[in-house]
Amino acid sequence: MKLRPLQMSDKTGGTGDDTSILTKTRSKTQRPPLYKVLLLNDDYTPMEFVVHVLERFFGLSHAQAFEIMLTVHKKGLAVVGVFSFEVAETKVAQVMDFARRHQHPLQCTMEKE
């Protein structure tokens, strides 16, 4: 018994001179939208508490946290990070809950990038 490679014409019953090409299109995977997490300034939350929040919930160094805290203080708000929806939502909830438990009016929000 002699084996030979299977050709496209073998499936369709053609003569073997079929020159059609099969193409497979790939749909491009769409990236999920990203969300900015923002801290808003207020006149009551101590600066050191804001620095602590940035270090604890966003993994920033003390120097990075201090810079963002100063931006919030001077400009009224600052972008802390950009995340997927679920991560941004969780970080906002964690910050807001932590601020409330410590009786600070610190506001943290998210918006689509």
Curated annotation (Swiss-Prot):
Name of a matching Pfam family: ClpS
Disulphide connectivity of cysteines: none
Sequence segments annotated as region (Disordered): 1-27
Polar residues compositional bias, start-end: 9-24
UniProt record, GO biological process: protein catabolic process; proteolysis
InterPro entries: ClpS, ClpS_core, Ribosomal_bL12_C/ClpS-like
Family statement: Belongs to the ClpS family.
Known partners and oligomeric status: Binds to the N-terminal domain of the chaperone ClpA.
Biological role: Involved in the modulation of the specificity of the ClpAP-mediated ATP-dependent protein degradation.
Name of the protein in its database record: ATP-dependent Clp protease adapter protein ClpS
